[in-house]
Amino acid sequence: MITGIQITKANDQALVNSFWLLDDEKAEARCVCANGQYAEDQVVAVSDLGQIEYREVPLEMQPTVRVEGGQHLNVNVLRRETLEDAVKHPEKYPQLTIRVSGYAVRFNSLTPEQQRDVIARTFTESL
C-alpha cells in the first residue's frame, strides 16, 4: 500500500517538511519534494531516511487506463449530396476536409477523378 507523508521531525534537518510516498511492500520511499540532497522522484530505502516522524497526507489515486491492441473507427459525417454539391459548386465548400488513406486533404484540391472516386468508395448502397 502507498502512503503519502510529510516529514515533521528528522535527525537530518534537510528532510523536515519534505513530502514522500511510502511503499510498505517494497520498504521504499519516493521523494515528491524536498530541500537539499534528495531529488524529485528519487527512490530510497525507507531505512535511509533514518529516524523520522511524519503526518499522513491524503492521496487521490486515479486509475490507470491501459489499452492494448487498439481499435480504429473512421466516422463519416457527410452526406453523398454534400460531396456531389461540392463537386458542382466548390466555392461553397472552401474548408471541406476529408480523410484519404490516413491523411486529411481539402476536397477541392483533389482532381475531378479523385473526387468521383472518393464519393464512390465512401458511399455504397450495401456492404
UniProtKB/Swiss-Prot annotation:
<dbReference type="Pfam" id="PF01228">
    <property type="entry name" value="Gly_radical"/>
</dbReference>
<protein>
    <recommendedName>
        <fullName>Autonomous glycyl radical cofactor</fullName>
    </recommendedName>
</protein>
<feature type="modified residue" description="Glycine radical">
    <location>
        <position position="102"/>
    </location>
</feature>
<dbReference type="InterPro" id="IPR001150">
    <property type="entry name" value="Gly_radical"/>
</dbReference>
<dbReference type="InterPro" id="IPR011140">
    <property type="entry name" value="Glycyl_radical_cofactor_GrcA"/>
</dbReference>
<keyword id="KW-0556">Organic radical</keyword>
<comment type="function">
    <text>Acts as a radical domain for damaged PFL and possibly other radical proteins.</text>
</comment>
<dbReference type="GO" id="GO:0005829">
    <property type="term" value="C:cytosol"/>
</dbReference>
<feature type="domain" description="Glycine radical">
    <location>
        <begin position="5"/>
        <end position="127"/>
    </location>
</feature>
<dbReference type="GO" id="GO:0008861">
    <property type="term" value="F:formate C-acetyltransferase activity"/>
</dbReference>
<dbReference type="InterPro" id="IPR019777">
    <property type="entry name" value="Form_AcTrfase_GR_CS"/>
</dbReference>
<dbReference type="InterPro" id="IPR050244">
    <property type="entry name" value="Auton_GlycylRad_Cofactor"/>
</dbReference>
